[in-house]
């Protein structure tokens, strides 16, 4: 299998390492490739949209014609994992906790409402333990950096994991979104779960 | 995509050990001010949260701004963060006098108008400018040689803060000392406000050379190096294992064009700071967009070419040849 990581900006290297760790845990043979051009999108069986700045990733991906390409592929069933900025990119409804609605290029394929910078600024970034039983894992420590929150889901989008008053991981068919950073965690459970979606 | 042998979690475990070491030292009274970050869950301001933040800046461009209008231009161009200053480095150089942190009112205005992270600079060793910015809630503090140093001998002990710090460095020793003091991100010092990339290139090459030399040394000589750099041996070992700095390293100082940005990425930097280069040019909107495009796509000369075509060389800022600066006019030598 070939898994692509959108690699303009953000935690793309960390996702690549984590995907490789997850592959070796599951005894899968596969490759991780950087996605930067429309032609890269044709090569992959699944795609990760990393954490970073969603405005930056959106602006560059749109400029290079990758945004539309990915959107069409996701609509056709390409498995996708969006973390933090990636979750923002996937959401149909995005606003900022302080600044409100701002226009930015998005993929917008997932029936989730996301609020950017929900917990506040970097000072309010935190780490905590989450329970991953619902996807076959145990407790694992994860980090939330200037994290968004998933306020609600509709249609067949469902909440997988909640924390305090919001959803931090959601799923809809081929799409997975997390507001925390599984790529910086010791546990590879989220990436293992994502790879299992590609296998199907 | 560059891949390393260690995951973020493994690097992080090491930094927790370093932070514990700092705690032990301060508990024994060797440091005057002792850090106390409560570790209940969910935990804010942890080493993990501080080191994670710069990871999400990688591949991006951080732009110096002096007001809301400039900050909005930066955000719309795709900057990953802005650095709020009172004066751009070019103007600091021209105006002389003591350069201090920016007006908190302006920083606050910028924070309320854009969604990307907002950073600000403090003078080297100025704990209280840093405390003020932490209280204000900026996302990252730059302890910067571009401002006039407040302490000629010491840098801030950054383990004490919940807000992550970025520090400048010209070589591996400087970088490791700042990391040991708790910096979460390093940037090359370059020579700010000159529009001349040569010093940033020099510093990045020195860093690369010193890292590759370190890797080739036998263990006993690495011990010696750790003493020379005045850092724990474990930190030197971590660099050897990773074959790079253990935290995010950006290029800064003199970057003025998309090709400059791509050059610094090619030399191994994780991202770019652009100071005077954008808002001292005559085409800031286009130039900001072009530099962002080039930094993210540095492996592809055709895209860098496209970015370079978006700007016009006769609108670039007038550069200053480093050789024409007097030794006392150099900013990079402040705070080693």
Swiss-Prot record, chain A:
UniProt subunit comment: In the presence of PdxS, forms a dodecamer of heterodimers. Only shows activity in the heterodimer.
Which Pfam family is one of this chain's hits? Answer: SNO
- The residues that hold L-glutamine are 52-54, 116, 145-146
Pathway assignment reads: Cofactor biosynthesis; pyridoxal 5'-phosphate biosynthesis
Q: Which PANTHER family match?
A: PYRIDOXAL 5'-PHOSPHATE SYNTHASE SUBUNIT SNO, PYRIDOXAL 5'-PHOSPHATE SYNTHASE SUBUNIT SNO1-RELATED
* Species name: Sulfolobus acidocaldarius (strain ATCC 33909 / DSM 639 / JCM 8929 / NBRC 15157 / NCIMB 11770)
- Briefly state the protein's biological role: Catalyzes the hydrolysis of glutamine to glutamate and ammonia as part of the biosynthesis of pyridoxal 5'-phosphate. The resulting ammonia molecule is channeled to the active site of PdxS.
Q: What is this protein called?
A: Pyridoxal 5'-phosphate synthase subunit PdxT
Assigned EC number: 4.3.3.6, 3.5.1.2
Gene Ontology CC terms, in alphabetical order: cytosol; glutaminase complex
Q: Where is the active site?
A: 84, 181, 183
Catalysis: reaction(s): aldehydo-D-ribose 5-phosphate + D-glyceraldehyde 3-phosphate + L-glutamine = pyridoxal 5'-phosphate + L-glutamate + phosphate + 3 H2O + H(+); L-glutamine + H2O = L-glutamate + NH4(+)
From Swiss-Prot, chain B:
Q: In which pathway does it act?
A: Cofactor biosynthesis; pyridoxal 5'-phosphate biosynthesis
Location of the active site: 121 (schiff-base intermediate with d-ribose 5-phosphate)
- Which Gene3D superfamilies does this entry report, sorted A to Z? Aldolase class I (3.20.20.70)
What GO MF terms are annotated? pyridoxal 5'-phosphate synthase (glutamine hydrolysing) activity
Q: Which InterPro entries match?
A: Aldolase_TIM, PdxS/SNZ, PdxS/SNZ_N, RibuloseP-bd_barrel
Keywords annotated in UniProt: Lyase, Pyridoxal phosphate, Schiff base
According to the UniProt entry, what is the EC number of this protein? 4.3.3.6
Q: Which residues bind D-ribose 5-phosphate?
A: 64, 193, 254, 275-276
Q: Which reaction does it catalyse?
A: aldehydo-D-ribose 5-phosphate + D-glyceraldehyde 3-phosphate + L-glutamine = pyridoxal 5'-phosphate + L-glutamate + phosphate + 3 H2O + H(+)
Q: Name one GO biological process term.
A: pyridoxal phosphate biosynthetic process
- Which Pfam family is one of this chain's hits? SOR_SNZ
Residues bound to D-glyceraldehyde 3-phosphate? 205
Q: Where are the transmembrane segments?
A: none
The family classification in the record reads:
Belongs to the PdxS/SNZ family.
Q: How does it assemble?
A: In the presence of PdxT, forms a dodecamer of heterodimers.
- Write down the HAMAP family for this protein, in alphabetical order: PdxS
- Alphabetical list of NCBIfam families matching this protein: PRK04180.1
Q: What does this protein do?
A: Catalyzes the formation of pyridoxal 5'-phosphate from ribose 5-phosphate (RBP), glyceraldehyde 3-phosphate (G3P) and ammonia. The ammonia is provided by the PdxT subunit. Can also use ribulose 5-phosphate and dihydroxyacetone phosphate as substrates, resulting from enzyme-catalyzed isomerization of RBP and G3P, respectively.
Query: What's the protein here called?
Result: Pyridoxal 5'-phosphate synthase subunit PdxS
Species of origin reads Sulfolobus acidocaldarius (strain ATCC 33909 / DSM 639 / JCM 8929 / NBRC 15157 / NCIMB 11770)
Gene name tied to this protein: pdxS
């Amino acid at each position: 299998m070939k898994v692509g990581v959108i690699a303009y900006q953000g935690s793309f290297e960390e996702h690549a390492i984590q995907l490789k760790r997850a592959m070796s845990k599951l005894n899968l043979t596969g490759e991780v490739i950087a996605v930067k051009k429309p032609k890269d999108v044709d090569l992959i069986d699944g795609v990760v949209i990393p954490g970073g700045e969603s405005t930056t990733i959106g602006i560059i991906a749109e400029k290079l014609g990758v945004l539309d390409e990915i959107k069409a592929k996701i609509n056709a069933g390409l498995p996708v994992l969006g973390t933090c900025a990636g979750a923002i990119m996937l959401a149909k409804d995005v606003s900022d906790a302080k600044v409100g609605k701002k226009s930015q290029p998005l993929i917008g394929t997932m029936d989730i409402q996301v609020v950017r910078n929900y917990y506040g600024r970097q000072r309010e970034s935190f780490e905590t333990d989450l329970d991953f039983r619902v996807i076959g894992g145990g407790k694992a420590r994860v980090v939330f950096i200037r994290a968004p929150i998933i306020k609600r889901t509709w249609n067949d989008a469902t909440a997988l994991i909640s924390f305090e008053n919001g959803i931090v991981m959601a799923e809809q068919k081929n799409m997975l979104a997390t507001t925390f950073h599984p790529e910086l965690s010791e546990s590879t459970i989220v990436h293992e779960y994502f790879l299992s979606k590609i296998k199907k | 995509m560059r891949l390393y042998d260690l995951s973020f979690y493994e690097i992080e475990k090491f930094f927790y050990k370093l932070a514990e070491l700092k705690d032990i030292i301060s508990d024994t009274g060797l440091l005057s001010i002792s850090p106390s970050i409560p570790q209940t869950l969910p935990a804010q301001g942890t080493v993990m949260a501080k080191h994670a933040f710069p990871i999400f800046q990688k591949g991006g461009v951080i732009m110096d701004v002096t007001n809301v209008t400039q900050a909005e231009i930066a955000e719309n161009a795709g900057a990953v963060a802005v650095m709020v200053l009172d004066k751009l480095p070019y103007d600091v150089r021209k105006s002389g006098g003591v350069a201090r942190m920016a007006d908190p009112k302006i920083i606050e205005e910028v924070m309320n108008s854009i969604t990307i992270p907002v950073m600000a600079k403090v003078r080297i060793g100025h704990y209280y400018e840093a405390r003020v910015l932490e209280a204000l809630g900026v996302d990252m503090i730059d302890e910067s040689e571009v401002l006039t140093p407040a302490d000629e001998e010491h840098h801030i002990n950054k383990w004490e803060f919940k807000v992550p710090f970025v520090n400048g460095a010209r070589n591996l020793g400087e970088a490791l000392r700042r990391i040991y003091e708790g910096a979460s991100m390093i940037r090359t010092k370059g020579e700010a406000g000159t529009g001349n990339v040569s010093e940033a290139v020099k510093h990045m090459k020195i860093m690369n050379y010193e890292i590759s030399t370190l890797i080739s040394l036998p263990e006993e000589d690495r011990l010696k190096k750790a003493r020379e750099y005045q850092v724990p041996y474990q930190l030197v070992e971590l660099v050897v294992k990773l074959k790079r700095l253990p935290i995010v390293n950006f290029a800064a100082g003199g970057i003025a064009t998309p090709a400059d940005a791509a050059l610094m990425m090619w030399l191994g930097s994780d991202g770019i700071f652009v100071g005077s280069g954008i808002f001292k040019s005559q085409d800031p909107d286009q130039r900001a967009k072009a530099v962002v495009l080039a930094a993210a796509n540095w492996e592809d000369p055709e895209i860098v070419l496209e970015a370079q075509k978006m700007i016009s060389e006769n609108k670039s800022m007038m550069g200053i040849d480093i050789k024409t600066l007097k030794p006392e006019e150099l900013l990079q030598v402040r705070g080693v």
